[in-house]
C-alpha cells in the first residue's frame, strides 16, 4: 500500500512574534507580527507549500494561540490529526525577534513548561508513522521529558517500519541542562538517522567537541546508519557528504537580507523536496539555498516559505543574473 505522506515532522510548533520595527533593539520595539514558528513546524509548512503531502506530530496549548497554530498548519495542507491539545495548562512556546540590522538580528525564547515538551510517548501512533515515507526529527524535542521519550519512540518505530529518518539538529540552548546531556541524546538519534542536517556549530554540539573538521565528523557518523550528512557553513555555503564517498557543494544566492533567522528551516524544506524527488544532491543543496535566501529577505519565516513555482523562478532569475554579470 502506498504511503499517505511524503513526510511527517515531529516536535515543536510555536508562535513567533516578529518585530515589525527594524533597526532597533527588542526593548525599544513596540509592534510585532504573529506567525507560526518552531523548526519542525516550519519545515512541515515549507514542505507542504512545495507540494509535499505532510503530517505532523506535536502538542500545542488548548487556547487561542494553540488553535491559531493548528488552524494555520491545516490551512497550508498539513494533516493535523496527530497534533494533541495539552489539557494540563501548559502554554505554547513564544519567540520574540528583533531586527537591529540585516547582519544583527536575535531571538528571545519563552520555553519554560512549553506545551510541545509535554508530548507523551503514548501519543505517538505507530499506525500514523506507518503512513509516511520519511520522519523529520528536530533536536529541540530531545531536550526534556516526556517529549524526549516520545521522539525516541517515534525513531524506533520508524526504524522498524523502514521509514527514512531525517535528523535536523536544530540546537537551541535554552532548554538543555548542559553540553554533555545534549551530546548524549543527539548522538542517540544521530546513530539511527539516515540523513543528518545541521550547521557546523551544531555538529560540534552533537560531538561535544569544538573545532572538528567536516571530514572528522563524517568519519565518525558514517560508522552508524547515516548515508547522507549535510553540513551548512553560513555564507560559505553547504556541503553534502555521502557514505559512498561523494561530496557536493553549493554556495549561497545573493539576496537582500532582512534577518538571519529562519534560514535553516527553509533550507531543510527545499533540500528535502529535491532529495525526495531524486533531483540530485547538488540540486537539493541549490533548492535549500534558494529557499533560505527567500525567507531571510522577508519578515516571516513560516509564511515566507516559497511554493515550487516561486522557488524555481527565484533560482532561474538568480542564475540568469549571474550569467549576465559574468
Swiss-Prot record:
Keyword list, A-Z: ATP-binding, Kinase, Nucleotide-binding, Transferase
GO biological process, one term: inositol catabolic process
Stored CDD domains: KdgK (cd01166)
Catalysed transformations (reactions): 5-dehydro-2-deoxy-D-gluconate + ATP = 6-phospho-5-dehydro-2-deoxy-D-gluconate + ADP + H(+)
Enzyme class name: transferase
Pfam families given in the database record: PfkB
Functional note: Catalyzes the phosphorylation of 5-dehydro-2-deoxy-D-gluconate (2-deoxy-5-keto-D-gluconate or DKG) to 6-phospho-5-dehydro-2-deoxy-D-gluconate (DKGP).
PANTHER family assigned: 5-DEHYDRO-2-DEOXYGLUCONOKINASE, HEXOKINASE FAMILY MEMBER
Family: Belongs to the carbohydrate kinase PfkB family.
Protein name: 5-dehydro-2-deoxygluconokinase
Source species: Lacticaseibacillus casei (Lactobacillus casei)
